[in-house]
Amino acid sequence: GPLALKWNYVPKMIPWFLRFIRNCSTKRMMHTAKNMHQILDLALPAYDELFEEINLEGLVEKKGILYIWNDQNLKSRKLEIKIRNELGVDQQVVTPKEIHDLEPNIKPIYHGGVYYQHGRHARNPKKILLKLFELFLKKGGKFLKMNIQDINFDVEKPILKSENQSFIFDKIVIACGSFSKRLTDNLDEKIPLDTERGYHIHFKDCDHLLSRPVIFQNRGFGITPMEQGLRVVGTVEFGGLKNPLSKLRIKNLINNAKYMMGDLPEHEDEWLGFRPTLPDYLPVIGPSKKHKNIFYC
């Protein structure tokens, strides 16, 4: 299934789960949806502003994103469509025939879907990131790779401490994703941050089989055509940052990909990513409540 637990990590997740349950009311869910919509509505214009300064030829495609499902979870899908309509999201409900016309290589496992025609996808995120990194250096940015172990203060100025060096700054931004908690805990800022472990595999030289990202909502996974082939991603696994990769989760992705696409070659590039997650599913963006010169992102 799309959700998995590492049982040795469950005791540590109990406070997070209790907070999550408190955020499952209709009122709290709508609060999250409205605020996330406001944030995501700014995402593409913000990317466009950055992309004006780098050459993205062939790295980003504007072919939309397709969500599909079968009848098993139709009630949930209708609620999602209703909420997005209320928020003004540009979405097109599509029939099985329209899904086939968009993506003829998908097996007929679906009964309906939604097409987001303005969606985009990256053909190679690493290449895009390296181009942005080069732009950062060109504009005078400096990059130091080291293990930051603690944050102290000189009056109000934050001091970053590594194993054998210290750096004093006027202001700092903590933007370490799921790993940020190691630093925020040292600041006595009890942010209920944890991680959703997501799995990835590639099927090399198969990107021609799809034109755009396709997400099968019943099983909680998606497939995106990329330079490396078809990237299959999905599942939410609660297990922290230290547990090893689960081969069962990889097998689950392989089976799901073949369930959607039929015969595929041997997969490549098994890897695990750590998505930061909070109980209300809203990000932490802005100044620290306790330290005015520290910002979170």
Residue ranges of each PLM-predicted region?
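C-terminal catalytic lobe of FAD-dependent flavoproteins
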Residues: 91, 217-218, 258-297
